[in-house]
Design a protein with these regions (language model features):
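N-proximal helix/coil linker or "cap" segments that precede and/or mark the start of modular domains
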Residues: 2-30
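Short, acidic, Ser/Thr-enriched surface-loop or helix-capping motifs
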Residues: 22, 35-36, 139-140
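Short loop/turn microsegments at loop-to-beta-strand junctions
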Residues: 28-29, 51-52, 133-135
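A short beta-strand-turn-helix
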Residues: 31-51
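Short active-site neighborhood of thiol/selenol oxidoreductases, capturing the structured segment around
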Residues: 46-66
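Typically the conserved alpha-helix immediately C-terminal to a functionally engaged Cys/Sec
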Residues: 64-78
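Short, internal strand/loop/helix patches
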Residues: 87, 97-133
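Thiol-/selenol-based redox modules, centered on thioredoxin-like
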Residues: 132-171
Length: 171
């Protein structure tokens, strides 16, 4: 019986780890996670109020991830003017996020997805590693995904999100 349970658990966790990432036009999967200060953040908190730029990244304090976080930091005012809330997500601990935020003066929350539930829900886990791929989702106030960026280049993430926002303004 224990073996059947273990096999079922392994199958389920493997399926979640390799779930497809949602695409533009899909309903964004709901999520709930704790930020660097232990505050619960839920996608539903923003429904009907704000767009959400949910960006997943591999690791605090690494070159590309720091560049990406600082890029969003430098543009968070512009994004806020467009009614966008920036939320970062990685497998790092709340303590690591607190240090990362303090070191680089980040001005948006980081979800400590230490168990990988949020990453798995969005299909962005890096294989079996406790690490997320670099993927960003722009989620509308209606809960639908407006744009997905999955390139490894952190600068492209912001530029593509900005272009998607500019496209919204024109329509």
């Amino acid at each position: 019986m224990k073996i059947k349970f273990l096999l079922a658990s392994l199958f389920l966790s493997t399926a979640l780890a390799f779930a497809d990432a949602p695409k533009t036009g899909d309903a964004a999967p709901s999520f709930e996670g704790k930020d660097q200060d232990g505050k619960t953040i839920k996608l539903s908190d923003f429904a009907g109020k704000k767009l959400v730029l949910l960006y997943f990244y591999p690791k605090d304090f690494t070159g590309g991830c720091t560049k990406e976080a600082c890029g969003f930091r430098d543009r968070v005012g512009e994004l806020a003017n467009n009614n966008v809330e920036v939320i970062g997500v990685s497998f790092d601990s709340a303590e690591s996020h607190q240090k990362f935020i303090a070191e680089y003066k980040l001005n948006f929350p980081l979800i400590a997805d230490t168990d990988g539930k949020v990453a798995d829900t969005y299909g962005v886990r890096m294989g079996f590693k406790p690490m997320a791929k670099r993927v960003s989702f722009l989620i509308g106030t209606d809960g639908k995904i407006i744009h997905v960026t999955d390139t490894g280049d952190p600068e492209i993430h912001f530029n593509e999100m900005k272009a998607a926002l500019d496209g919204l303004k024109k329509s």
